[in-house]
A protein has these predicted regions:
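Active-site rim/adjacent substrate-binding subdomains
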Residues: 2-189, 194-260
Length: 260
């Protein structure tokens, strides 16, 4: 997540539950999947040594690179290489004026994120979360303006829970439980979405999405010009879940009609 994250609705409105803001439109894909909990990992879900290899200096992967939609493997090797990766990620984050960064954003498809809401090296608290899983989130929803290092120049309101509780591991492999609220919870959820292949425009309401559409098209055009590749249209995990749910409901309805 980029450092510019304004409470754009103002302190009074931003602190209100979503239900008290009549002007906020429904989310594009619904909020039921806003926080995705990762299923238990099978052996093949774990990253290999090759998956964790990287060459410094790391660079931020920009939308619409398919790396941002790829599957991210869990980590079960906690060594000097992992610590070096987290150090490099913090360096990239600070140099690009970010406050959070996920591993896939630097081209490493594993379940790892770093963040520091202060956004300045030597200030605030540096947090490293490996293999995070959300087990509880608040019902209170807030709207804040977000930006993303993978989407330069794009800023938009996104609705998220005010606080979350997390199971994760630290960089040594020790299991930890974390409760985050406010800005820290917001940054975590943004980065956690990246680990599920979810991008922040997947969370935008239709009217907000429309306001950034031209910016997205510009990034798509730059990607095609720089790579010579046409943009790969990959269905968002959030949208895919919605589509599958619709088909399941249709199938269930059809089955009931046959039975009765």
């Amino acid at each position: 997540m980029a450092a510019r994250l304004h409470f754009s609705l103002g302190p009074r409105l931003a602190g209100l539950p979503l239900s008290r803001r009549g002007s906020v439109a429904p989310l594009r894909h619904g909020f039921g999947s806003a926080v995705v909990t990762a299923p238990p990992a099978e052996d093949e879900d774990f990253a290999t040594a090759a998956d964790l290899q990287f060459e410094p200096p790391l660079k931020v992967v920009k939308y619409p690179d398919p790396i941002l939609r790829a599957r991210n493997k869990r980590i079960n090797t906690f060594d000097d290489n992992l610590r070096s990766l987290t150090d490099e990620m913090f360096d990239v984050m600070y140099k690009t004026d970010g406050i959070g960064l996920s591993a896939p954003q630097v081209g490493v498809n594993v379940q790892l994120m770093v963040f520091n809401p202060a956004g300045v090296k030597g200030e605030g608290e540096e947090i490293v979360l490996v293999n995070p899983v959300v087990y509880k989130m608040s019902k209170r929803l807030l709207v804040y303006e977000e930006s993303c290092l993978s989407f330069p120049g794009i800023y938009a309101n996104v609705v998220r829970p005010d606080n979350v509780k997390i199971d994760a591991q630290d960089v040594t492999g020790a299991k930890i439980k974390v409760k985050l609220s406010g800005l820290s919870a917001r940054v975590f959820q943004h980065e956690f979405d990246h680990l599920q292949g979810i991008l922040f425009f997947d969370r935008m309401s239709l009217d907000v999405l429309e306001s950034v559409r031209e910016g997205l098209k510009d990034l798509e055009k730059k990607y095609e010009e720089s790579t010579g590749l046409a943009m790969l249209k990959i269905l968002s995990p959030v949208l895919l879940e919605q589509v599958l749910a619709v088909f399941q409901n249709i199938l269930l309805s059809f089955t009931l009609k046959i039975v009765y």
